[in-house]
Amino acid sequence: MKTFRLLTALTLGTLLWGCAESGKKAEGPFYTDIESRAQLHDWFRYAPERPIVVSGHRGGMVTGYPENCIESFEKTLSMMPSFFEIDPRLTKDSVIVLMHDATIDRTTTGTGKVSDYTFEELQQFFLKDREGNVTPYKIPTLEECIVWSRGKTILNLDIKDVHSSSVGI
């Protein structure tokens, strides 16, 4: 229950921080621009006249698009109303990046632990899609993802090895 409350607070905080920082409205096929806690609750409340909303676990499962990648989030949002569960991890130089696993072996062209690399070192690798195909995409930072998400979608942070105070919410 404590973990659920923490994740809810982080999700809400990320969403509202993004809305407060956003000076302009984003436009896209299924973008969601939520400006208050009440709107957030309404958005998650079932209403038969509204389209079904998908939780994109790690960003979705589209061939050619890797998990925990902004381009994947954008692709999923182009197809359906979505919010995204993402996985923050800490690099050796304390940059928060998106990566589900503690290692980069499965999802990138590199090997080893995320925490053994600096952010700059991680940028030499390319992300792979779920079939293992190499894509042109790189590992994003949590900050890049939050900036991208403003006025577009909701992020649900699945806290791994990053302390919640590091997220700044």
Where are these regions (language model features)?
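Phosphate-group recognition and catalysis centered on beta-loop-alpha active-site segments
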Residues: 19-169
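Bacterial Sec-dependent N-terminal signal peptides
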Residues: 1-27
